C-alpha cells in the first residue's frame, strides 16, 4: 500500500518456453469435502473522491500465425441439484447513465471469410419437460 502515489503491483506469470508450450496459471478455491467449496472473488477496489474504480480485463493473447485462444465463462455440472448460473450485469448510477452491455461477434477484413456469429440458445430439457426460455425485456422509464 501507499500513502502517496501508486500502490503496489502484483504480476503473476507462468514460465515461457522457447520451443514448446508456455506454462499455465491455475487459481483454484479450496475443496469442501463435506460442504461447499470456497469462493474466488475477483474485484477492483473503490475509487477515491476524484477517480474511477479500476477495470478488469479478461482476454487471450494475440496469435500471429495461428488461432488465438478462447475465453470461456461457465458454471459446473450439477448431478442432483440446480446447475449454477452465469450472470452478467453492469452497474447502475444515481446521477449518470447506467452501464452498457455489448455483445458482438468478431469481424474480418479478409474477402474470403465470414464474420463471426452471435448465438443465444436456451437449455434443452428431458423428454417430459420443455426447454428453457429466452427473454428480452426493456425497462420502463422512472
Residue ranges: model-predicted function:
Residues 1-142:
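Surface-exposed, glycine- and small/polar-enriched segments that build interaction surfaces at terminal
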